[in-house]
Every structure is written in structure tokens, then in C-alpha cells.
């Protein structure tokens, strides 16, 4: 993996994580209490984000190898799937909390792999969102 691939992978996976979490949070806030519907929403954003990030990367510099766009798209798809994993088993408070925990862990892994520390502010926002959503669900 080249340094450029690593950059695309980090950018794409973090974008996927946050995009999917945003859609899931919106669905929960709108009162969706079905694991299947949350998965459908997460799948929709995963497909849209993957196409958008991959195409955007390719079109931003067509003189470069399409490999960059493929790495970006694959990483975005992978990142988008992580927050949705708990809802495969259904819907409930534990799935909402697991969604937040997996997203935080994913962000930490991405940041750690790159050698950066995820700022406390980002993690505090994600944690607050997770706790807030679980309280709303209860």
C-alpha cells in the first residue's frame, strides 16, 4: 500500500463512518425503530457515499491512476458498513450503543493507524450523540 493509498483509505473510511452514523442518527431521531429499516437507510448512504467519493476522487484528477478512486470507494464502503453492523440483529438500546461504540472504535483505529490522535472533541461529540440517542430510544 502506497502512502497515497493510505491517505485515500483513511479519508474514505472516516467519511463512510461519519456519513453512516449521521443517517442512522437521523433515522433514530425520526422515530424509526426497526433494524431492517435502519439497515436499509445505512445501505443507501453506503452506496451513495461510495459512488460519490470514488467518482469525486477520480474526476478531481483524471490524469492520475484510477486506483486512487478505487481505494477511496472501497474504504468509504467499508467505513459505511461499520456503524450499521449492530442493527443486523434487530433494534434496541444495545444496538444503538453498539453502533456508537463501533463508530468510536473505528475512528480510533483509523486515527491510530495514521499516527494521529483523534481529537477529544470529535470523540466527545460521537459519544454524546450515542448516549443521547440511547436515551431517546429508551
Residues of each region from the PLM?
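Transmembrane alpha-helical segments of integral membrane proteins
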Residues: 97-115
Amino acid at each position: 500500500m502506497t502512502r497515497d493509498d493510505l491517505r485515500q483509505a483513511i479519508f474514505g473510511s472516516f467519511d463512510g463512518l461519519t456519513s453512516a452514523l449521521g443517517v442512522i442518527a437521523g433515522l433514530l431521531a425520526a422515530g424509526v425503530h426497526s433494524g431492517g429499516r435502519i439497515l436499509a437507510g445505512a445501505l443507501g448512504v453506503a452506496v451513495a457515499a461510495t459512488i460519490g467519493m470514488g467518482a469525486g476522487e477520480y474526476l478531481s484528477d483524471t490524469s492520475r491512476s484510477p486506483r486512487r478512486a478505487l481505494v477511496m470507494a472501497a474504504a468509504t464502503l467499508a467505513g459505511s458498513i461499520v456503524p450499521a453492523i449492530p442493527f443486523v440483529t434487530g433494534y434496541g438500546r444495545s444496538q444503538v450503543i453498539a453502533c456508537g461504540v463501533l463508530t468510536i472504535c473505528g475512528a480510533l483505529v483509523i486515527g491510530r493507524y495514521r499516527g494521529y490522535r483523534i481529537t477529544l472533541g470529535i470523540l466527545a461529540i460521537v459519544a454524546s450523540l450515542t448516549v443521547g440517542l440511547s436515551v431517546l430510544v429508551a
